[in-house]
Amino acid sequence: MCIRDRYNPEHQFLASRGYAVLSMNFRGSTGYGRNHVKMANGQWGRKMQDDVTDSVNWAVEQGIADPDNVCIYGASYGGYAVMAGITKTPKMYKCAVNYVGVTDMGLLFSKMPKVWEIWEEQQKIEIGDYDNDKEYLDAVSPINLVDRIETPLYIVHGVRDWRVPIQHAQKLRRELEKNGKVEGEDFWWMVKTDEGHGFYKEANKMELYTELEEFFGRYLKDS
């Protein structure tokens, strides 16, 4: 589900621009033992997200973060955490970047990759069983909570993504527009036809990080 934090060039990129970077190993992250992983079972959008919120509050209390200057950025499950963050705690973040993130829990199950079918029963334990847990999963599905979004949002995805299909981003874009959000004012959109679950081509990475530097700089003020 999530991997233990380690050296990450994105962290260094952001830190080199003067930002304090907080990357937390919320429950479900590997590297801290089986119990830490199992604590995440059935907790998407619940206690897993509370771990993120609590970490931000801790950073504020420690004087590391300015409560008026916090952005949230994540990829894959981290992208889901971004969406959960700006729908569950919409006042907490000045801006947000959802990078190849899950937005629709129903779509996550209906579009599950063939190679993951052997893990289907484990997925039901870790995330939930959509046939039996539909009410819970719909309640923590960001696509159903778009009306709560107040935070400027950058959506980044690859058309060839087989882990989190492009439909997650496309549905989110449509729902934002249905709720009166305007591209270029309320949300931004970067999709690459030659990328999958993350950008790997140098030109695309350069474009992405140039855009992110400008985006964060627009909303995070010197304090």
Predicted regions and their residues:
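Short, small-residue-biased leader/transition segments that mark boundaries at the very start
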Residues: 1-3
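Active-site-proximal cap/loop segments of hydrolase catalytic domains
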Residues: 5-17, 23-223
